[in-house]
Amino acid sequence: MAGVSVRDVAAQDFINAYASFLQRQGKLEVPGYVDIVKTSSGNEMPPQDAEGWFYKRAASVARHIYMRKQVGVGKLNKLYGGAKSRGVRPYKHIDASGSINRKVLQALEKIGIVEISPKGGRRISENGQRDLDRIAAQTLEEDE
């Protein structure tokens, strides 16, 4: 399908399809500690999907950067952060782990999906945009 972009596909469908693509491809460098680490200091437990959550985070980050022109680690920390349960006190927003988001960006940069932006942060590369559009077209075909 010509002219299909990531914007034409539902977010959850695209993220699942791209995460499985990254997992099948096997080029994404996954840190050894992903099965035991929490994704935020506000979380009580690590993710339940011990093997696949890093790929889903990478797919989600790639889509997020595609939708916006450039994104830094700080913005991703805010995006993936959440509410911390503080007992009887009111909830409070806690940022996500910067280390995990930094490792995701470095892994995506290593396989050529994102590149460092001269203005700061990361932006999608030409090869990354082509790959994401191709996966989006395949996802749209499967849905129809």
From Swiss-Prot:
Cytoplasm keyword on record: yes
GO terms of molecular function: RNA binding; structural constituent of ribosome
SMART domains, sorted: Ribosomal_S19e
Highest rank taxon of the organism: Eukaryota
Entry GO CC: cytosol; cytosolic small ribosomal subunit
Record keywords, A-Z: Cytoplasm, Ribonucleoprotein, Ribosomal protein, Ribosome biogenesis
Compartment(s) where it occurs, according to its Swiss-Prot or TrEMBL record: Cytoplasm
Keyword Thylakoid among UniProt keywords: no
GO BP annotation list: ribosomal small subunit assembly; ribosomal small subunit biogenesis; ribosomal subunit export from nucleus; translation
Knocked-out gene: effects: Disruption of a single RPS19 gene reduces cell growth; a double disruption is lethal. Depletion experiments show the proteins are required for correct maturation of precursor rRNA to generate the 18S small rRNA. A specific site between the 18S and 5.8S precursors (site A2 in ETS1) is not cleaved in disruption mutants. Partially assembled ribosomes are retained in the nucleolus rather than being exported to the cytoplasm. All effects are exacerbated in the double disruption. Increases association of NOC4 with 20/21S pre-rRNA, decreases association of ENP1, TSR1 and RIO2 with 20/21S pre-rRNA.
Primary location recorded for the protein, binned into one broad class: cytoplasm
Misc. remarks from the entry: Present with 3440 molecules/cell in log phase SD medium. There are 2 genes for eS19 in yeast.
Protein family according to the UniProt entry: Belongs to the eukaryotic ribosomal protein eS19 family.
Assembly and binders: Component of the small ribosomal subunit (SSU). Mature yeast ribosomes consist of a small (40S) and a large (60S) subunit. The 40S small subunit contains 1 molecule of ribosomal RNA (18S rRNA) and 33 different proteins (encoded by 57 genes). The large 60S subunit contains 3 rRNA molecules (25S, 5.8S and 5S rRNA) and 46 different proteins (encoded by 81 genes).
Function of the protein: Component of the ribosome, a large ribonucleoprotein complex responsible for the synthesis of proteins in the cell. The small ribosomal subunit (SSU) binds messenger RNAs (mRNAs) and translates the encoded message by selecting cognate aminoacyl-transfer RNA (tRNA) molecules. The large subunit (LSU) contains the ribosomal catalytic site termed the peptidyl transferase center (PTC), which catalyzes the formation of peptide bonds, thereby polymerizing the amino acids delivered by tRNAs into a polypeptide chain. Required for proper maturation of the small (40S) ribosomal subunit. Binds to 40s pre-ribosomal particles, probably required after association of NOC4 but before association of ENP1, TSR1 and RIO2 with 20/21S pre-rRNA.
Protein name: Small ribosomal subunit protein eS19B
Species annotation: Saccharomyces cerevisiae (strain ATCC 204508 / S288c)
